[in-house]
């Protein structure tokens, strides 16, 4: 018996099931390169760390999720000082760098996969995506990651895809943005 080619294994969920799963999420695990960034890596000069760009909208979405009680993990096979600094500035709870087996790294956190949403864009994300309750892929994801996802996002990695995920989860939890005198807050309507 031959295996079905990956391109035919699209995973879809009915809207009600997707909303139920998103409402139950307690941890969102993000791949970094190509998901929180656009996937490009720049080199500024000799001995310099790599240059990565993160979108401010994504950062605000991550803060909103954290303030709503959802834990955040960043999981990357690389080690970049810029990733560490950005994660610290957003108070990311779990920063996992230098791990090729992202699924095993997430399992070490002890959180059941039924409570985890995963956002990935490439082949090394697929095992985590297949295990997660809900898997997202940015618009610019590779075909294997896109096929392994439940939700193909409208925005690209590093250009608002993470914010799109955050807003979907917050809405599934019954929260909506309100303009308050001191800024926008997410709360129950």
Language model features with spans:
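Substrate-recognition element of Asp-dependent hydrolases with the DxDx(T/V) motif
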Residues: 35, 62-86
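Asp-based phosphoryl-transfer active-site loop
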Residues: 22-40, 129, 162
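Basic, amphipathic juxtamembrane/active-site segments
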Residues: 40-63
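Conserved beta-strand/loop elements of the cytosolic catalytic core of P-type E1-E2 ATPases, chiefly
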Residues: 74-77, 96-100
């Amino acid at each position: 018996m031959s295996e079905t080619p990956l391109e035919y294994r699209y995973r879809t969920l009915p809207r009600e099931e997707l909303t139920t799963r998103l409402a139950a999420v307690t941890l969102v695990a993000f791949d970094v390169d190509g998901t929180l960034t656009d996937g490009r890596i720049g080199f500024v000069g000799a001995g310099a760390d790599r240059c990565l760009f993160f979108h401010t909208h994504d950062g605000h979405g991550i803060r909103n999720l954290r303030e709503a009680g959802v834990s955040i993990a960043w999981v990357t096979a690389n080690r970049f000082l810029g990733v560490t600094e950005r994660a610290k500035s957003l108070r990311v709870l779990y920063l996992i760098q230098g791990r090729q087996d992202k699924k095993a790294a997430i399992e070490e956190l002890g959180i059941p996969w039924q409570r985890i949403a995963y956002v990935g864009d490439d082949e090394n994300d697929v095992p985590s995506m297949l295990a997660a309750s809900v898997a997202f892929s940015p618009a610019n994801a590779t075909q294997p990651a896109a096929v392994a996802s439940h939700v193909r996002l409208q925005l690209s990695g590093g250009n608002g895809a993470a914010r799109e995920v955050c807003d979907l989860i917050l809405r599934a939890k019954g929260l909506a943005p309100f303009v308050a005198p001191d800024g926008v807050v997410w709360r129950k309507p």
